[in-house]
Each structure stands twice: as structure tokens, then as C-alpha cells.
């Protein structure tokens, strides 16, 4: 289930005061928390009353609106209560094409079952020691 959430910015306005420092107030663009919660609960309780009478239970299948912003308003209040709640978005399902099977590729693998299995051309430069001896280097080219 997916939904869209838009939170309008809070406006800070200075209030006139007799004190030299101005006071700021928060103006929320929507109704108060109490009125918004009562409307959400009344919508929710009418749709889920047949299922349960527990106010902490939410019926996710009975409403066309996403309930997550409403729950956020109840839990954290503040900015969450000023959110616009939009209808749930249903994503279109697209058929997935099966990947084309690639042809098997022949590869040449080195045998790594001996402690001296190295690339002979690079062995003397990288490892030195016995890998620089003529007996080991004779098959390098």
C-alpha cells in the first residue's frame, strides 16, 4: 500500500507585545488537532465497527485513504496533523519479460592443485626466489 503525504510549511508570525523581544506563534494551515482527530476517528469507527470495537485497531482495507498520516497525527502531532491526505495510489503491474538465456561459453581454466601453479611469465617478477630459476622459467614462453 502506498500513499502520498504533503506537509505544508508552518508560518511563524511575530505578535505585538509590550516587551521589547517579539513573541512568535505557530499557525497551522488546517483545523486543530482535536477536530481533525475526531473526524478521523468517526470515519474510521463507522467503517470498522463490525470488525472490532478496539479504538487502537485500524482497518486498513475499508478506507480509500492511507491511514499512516492519521496515525502520525495521533502519535507525534505537530506537523503531522497539518498533512494533506491523498487517496491511495495503486501501481500498474507490468508484465516482466524473461531474460534471454545466453549460450554456454568455453573457458580455459588453470589447474590450481599445485603450490607452484602461477603465471610463469609473471612469477619471477612478482614472487622471485625459486620461480626465477631456469628450470621453472623454461616453459614460460
UniProtKB/Swiss-Prot annotation:
A Gene Ontology BP annotation from the UniProt entry: circadian rhythm
Coiled-coil zones: none
PTM: May form interchain disulfide bonds with LFNR1 and LFNR2.
Protein induction: Expression is controlled by light and by a circadian clock. Differentially regulated at the level of mRNA stability at different times of day, being a target of the degradation pathway mediated by the downstream (DST) instability determinant and thus following a circadian clock rhythm with highest levels in early afternoon. Rapidly degraded upon illumination; this degradation coincides with the release of the LFNR from the thylakoid membrane.
Bias kind Low complexity: ranges: 35-51
Source organism per UniProt: Arabidopsis thaliana
Subunit record text: Component of high molecular weight thylakoid LFNRs-containing protein complexes containing LIR1, LFNR1, LFNR2, TIC62 and TROL proteins. Interacts directly with LFNR1 and LFNR2; LIR1 increases the affinity of LFNR1 and LFNR2 for TIC62 and subsequent thylakoid relocalization.
Protein encoded by which gene: LIR1
Purpose of the protein: Thylakoid-determinant subunit of high molecular weight LFNRs-containing protein complexes.
Region (2 X 15 AA approximate repeats): 58-132
Sequence repeats, residue ranges: 67-81, 118-132
Entry GO CC: chloroplast; chloroplast envelope; chloroplast stroma; chloroplast thylakoid membrane protein complex; cytosol
Presence of the UniProt keyword Thylakoid in the record: yes
One protein family per Pfam: Lir1
Annotated compartments: Plastid, Chloroplast thylakoid membrane; Plastid, Chloroplast envelope; Plastid, Chloroplast stroma
Phenotype upon gene inactivation: Slight increase in nonphotochemical quenching (NPQ). Marked decrease in the accumulation of LFNR1 and LFNR2-containing thylakoid protein complexes.
Chain segment of the transit peptide: 1-41
Topology with respect to the bilayer: Peripheral membrane protein
Record key words, sorted: Chloroplast, Disulfide bond, Membrane, Plastid, Repeat, Thylakoid, Transit peptide
Name of the protein in its database record: Light-regulated protein 1, chloroplastic
Amino acid at each position: 500500500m502506498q500513499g502520498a503525504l504533503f506537509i505544508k510549511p508552518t508560518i511563524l508570525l511575530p505578535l505585538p507585545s509590550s516587551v521589547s523581544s517579539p513573541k512568535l506563534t505557530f499557525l497551522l494551515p488546517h483545523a486543530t488537532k482535536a477536530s481533525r482527530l475526531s473526524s478521523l476517528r468517526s470515519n474510521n469507527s463507522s467503517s470498522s465497527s463490525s470488525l472490532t470495537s478496539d479504538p487502537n485497531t485500524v482497518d486498513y482495507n475499508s478506507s480509500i485513504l492511507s491511514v499512516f498520516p492519521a496515525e502520525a497525527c495521533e502519535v507525534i502531532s505537530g506537523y503531522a496533523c497539518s498533512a494533506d491526505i491523498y487517496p491511495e495510489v495503486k501501481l500498474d503491474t507490468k508484465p516482466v519479460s524473461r531474460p534471454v538465456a545466453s549460450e554456454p561459453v568455453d573457458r580455459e581454466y588453470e589447474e590450481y592443485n599445485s603450490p607452484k601453479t602461477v603465471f610463469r611469465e609473471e612469477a619471477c617478477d612478482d614472487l622471485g626466489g625459486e620461480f626465477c630459476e631456469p628450470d621453472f622459467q623454461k616453459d614460460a614462453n
